[in-house]
Amino acid sequence: MLSVVIAPGQGAPVFTRNAQVPHYAASTMKAAVLAALYRSDLDWDARVPVVNRFRSRTGSVYGNDRAEDSDPLPWERLGEQVPLRWLAERMVSHSSNLATNLCLQQVGHPAVAEVWRRAGAKGGSPRGIEDAAARKAGVNNLVSALDLARLLQSLEPEVLALLEHNTHRVDLAAGLPPGVRLAGKNGWITGVRLSAALVHPDDAPPYVLSVCYTGPLAGGRDVEDPAARLLARISRGVWQRRHTIAAAGR
């Protein structure tokens, strides 16, 4: 299943394909956690204990698997205290699962749910990363391409600026010329590859591209993934038509 949404930076989509079909959110939910942190009254300079013990939505306790995390740095700080700001940055720049659950533990699930609601999303992310007990109980993080597009359009400039630091640039970013600014978040597990970004061409207005793929091309690797190459091809094609997006949205 391939879902695509193309829209101006602010405005209704100009192209949709399976736009409201739900996909497993994977790490795209980290953008919503970041927005919830930004909109909270939490002190980003406060120091947070780095632990690997979290409360499941079922009431049990779970932890993250270090081998499944794309960012080793937060794991090296286990038992220490680090600034919340650093965790928020690692969550979106290197897609740290451990940092995500630590941030989620600070801000709370209701605040993240409010981010999705304000964006106009039908889906959301009601549980943390690797909360297997909640997943077995039917609590799933599901989003559509339209949900992700609306989320990006709802974000404050400061949140988008942090999303520009995403270092995983093998899908939508790989389809753009070098140096093109984009703010977004991607996610991948076996069977799923998603990516949504606000792209800033120098010669055209900003546009949002959101692509969700569920199927056999998604091998679950952060690099050398056929599904990532598919998303890059889509991104390249949209880039070539970037001058028509704003006009089509009027």
Model-derived regions, located:
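A conserved catalytic-loop motif detector
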Residues: 137-178
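Short pre-catalytic segments that frame enzyme active sites
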Residues: 1-24, 39-41
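Conserved catalytic neighborhood of penicillin-recognizing serine enzymes
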Residues: 56-101, 109
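Active-site SXXK
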Residues: 24-50, 91, 209
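Mid-domain, small-residue-enriched loop/turn segments at the edges of structured enzyme/sensor domains
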Residues: 1-2, 80-84, 94-152
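Structured C-terminal helix/loop/strand segments within mature extracytoplasmic catalytic/sensor domains
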Residues: 10-14, 22, 106-108, 156-170, ...
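Short glycine/serine- and small hydrophobic-enriched flexible loop segments
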Residues: 35-42, 105, 150-156, 236-240
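Second-shell loop/turn segments in exported
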Residues: 16-23, 73-78, 86-90, 98-104, ...
